[in-house]
């Protein structure tokens, strides 16, 4: 990027519309090619020559597409000619344009992000290698909250919504018109069902989604900073947010004439927001009435501002002391542990009954069994079955596959306080492995285990089982108290695929 910094510096009069000319500059294509932003798959780049040429960067293809962009009518393909032009390079050109959009449209965001960090020292964090770094945040914060809003973020159903979202951040009308033109031409291809594979670059689609979410969250944070409500210190009167700013301006008049009780403008700082995989949670200590207000804020925001049909059923209000919160593959809830503390002052002693609130992470056994049943490891009731598609592999390969899945799930859910459900999942995978091997050798499970012995199942021992057997005595290791031990594995770099399946 530093190599091309000189090309990207424009005077003040042109900074509002400098993106569109970049589509006609060859060095931008070189920039995209050098940074590897144009990958359709792991081994092929769309800025390479066609099959008839050497697989090198082609300036000839770049010159051709620039010439076609000067004459946009040549990029438009009538629906009657879609089948006839399928073998030509029009689809290839649209792939290149989507790659170029992914590079060019990110330039103002990158420059703005770099300028925001100037003169600031970034805080170093040494706990970014594990997804489990989020769980201390949940344990420290959620234990003080009462309610959680579980929001399913909707996707825009119309392309014009995406164009309008970018319009607030990209002040280049020419680029937006060209962007709208390419999107509608892409829909023309997609709706005609010629190419089943998406012709747009995944990086470009990810940028569109992130810009859409960024616009939504910026409005939400704006409302969050300015959200307040009027209430009396004696909790006798509660005011709605009708004509809220008028109430603020005439606050003294309202206080003196209409309400004899002491009033205060209350601003709740205990509001935490987390977003993950198209879902977001909003935790707070507010009352149920205020939680319903936030719920309708979200519904009206998506319907009125983003023109997206958003049903109120997609926003669930959960009470942490009663309901479970599904997040990161866990079912989290608050567990109340009564604790009696004896305190003595001189000659008098007191018994104080305290309640300790602790975040409890449970294993969603139903969803995991559903994922295993979907992948043919068991049936919908959780009874193990043989994996017929793996019988062509070698015995060691089959065993290694099952052991890898079993250990991944065991490591991921090792932080749960109750592991009975985890032991059930391990049992399903172990018996499924034995049934698969027995089916391959055309034998019964009993005869197969009798021939190989119990040493086969020792491969399924996880690192947790081995460590606990060395730390705790055998009597404690065999007791029922062991399943409450919480051990987090901090070497997991990605989520297990079975956790994300629905």
Curated annotation (Swiss-Prot):
Query: What species is given as this protein's source?
Result: Arabis blepharophylla (Coast rock-cress)
This entry's Gene Ontology molecular function terms read: RNA binding
Q: Which family does it belong to?
A: Belongs to the intron maturase 2 family. MatK subfamily.
Q: What is this protein called?
A: Maturase K
Against InterPro entries, the record matches this protein to: Domain_X, Maturase_MatK, Maturase_MatK_N
User: What does the UniProt keyword field contain?
Assistant: Chloroplast, mRNA processing, Plastid, RNA-binding, tRNA processing
The terms describing its cellular component in GO are: chloroplast
Q: Name where it's found.
A: Plastid, Chloroplast
Function, as annotated, reads: Usually encoded in the trnK tRNA gene intron. Probably assists in splicing its own and other chloroplast group II introns.
> HAMAP family per the record?
MatK
Q: What's the short name of a Pfam family annotated to this entry?
A: Intron_maturas2
């Amino acid at each position: 990027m530093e190599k091309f910094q000189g090309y990207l510096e424009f005077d003040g009069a042109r900074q509002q519309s400098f993106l569109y000319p970049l589509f006609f500059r060859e060095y931008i294509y070189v920039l995209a090619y050098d940074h590897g932003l144009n990958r359709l798959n792991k081994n092929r780049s769309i800025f390479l020559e066609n099959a008839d040429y050497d697989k090198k960067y082609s300036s000839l293809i770049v010159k051709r597409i620039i010439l076609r962009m000067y004459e946009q009518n040549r990029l438009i393909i009538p629906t009657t000619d879609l089948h006839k032009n399928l073998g030509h390079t029009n689809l290839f050109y649209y792939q290149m344009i989507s790659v170029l959009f992914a590079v060019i449209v990110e330039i103002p965001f990158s420059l703005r992000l770099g300028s925001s960090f100037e003169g600031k020292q970034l805080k170093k964090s040494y706990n970014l290698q594990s997804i489990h770094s989020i769980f201390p945040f949940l344990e420290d914060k959620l234990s003080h909250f009462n309610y959680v809003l579980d929001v399913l973020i909707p996707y825009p159903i119309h392309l014009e919504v995406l164009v309008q979202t970018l319009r607030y951040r990209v002040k280049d009308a020419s680029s937006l018109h060209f962007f709208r033109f390419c999107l509608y031409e892409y829909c023309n291809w997609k709706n005609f069902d010629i190419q089943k594979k998406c012709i747009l670059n995944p990086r470009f689609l990810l940028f569109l989604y992130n810009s859409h979410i960024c616009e939504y969250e910026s409005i939400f944070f704006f409302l969050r900073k300015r959200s307040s409500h009027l209430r009396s210190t004696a909790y006798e009167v509660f005011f709605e947010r009708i004509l809220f700013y008028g109430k603020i301006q005439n606050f003294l008049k309202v206080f003196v004439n209409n309400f004899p009780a002491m009033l205060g403008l209350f601003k709740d700082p205990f509001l935490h927001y987390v977003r993950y995989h198209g879902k977001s949670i909003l935790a707070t200590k507010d009352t149920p009435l205020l939680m319903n207000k936030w719920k309708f804020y979200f519904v009206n925001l998506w319907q009125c501002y983003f023109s997206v049909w958003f049903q109120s059923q997609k926003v669930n209000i959960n009470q942490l002391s009663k309901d479970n919160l599904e997040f990161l593959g866990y079912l989290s809830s608050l567990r109340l542990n009564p604790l009696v503390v004896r305190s003595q002052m001189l000659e008098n002693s007191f018994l104080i009954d305290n309640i300790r609130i602790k975040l409890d992470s449970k294993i969603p056994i139903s969803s995991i069994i559903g994922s295993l049943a979907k992948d043919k490891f068991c049936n919908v009731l959780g009874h193990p079955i043989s994996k017929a598609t793996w019988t062509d592999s070698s015995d060691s390969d089959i065993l290694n596959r099952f052991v890898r899945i079993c250990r991944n799930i065991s490591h991921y859910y090792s932080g749960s306080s109750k592991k009975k459900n985890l032991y059930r999942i391990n049992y399903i995978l172990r018996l499924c492995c034995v049934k698969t091997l027995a089916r391959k050798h055309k034998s019964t499970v009993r005869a197969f285990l009798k021939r190989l012995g119990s040493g086969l199942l020792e491969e399924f021992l996880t690192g947790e089982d081995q460590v606990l057997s060395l730390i705790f005595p055998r009597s404690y290791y065999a007791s029922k108290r062991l399943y409450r031990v919480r051990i987090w594995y901090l070497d997991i770099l990605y989520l297990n695929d079975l956790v994300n399946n629905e």
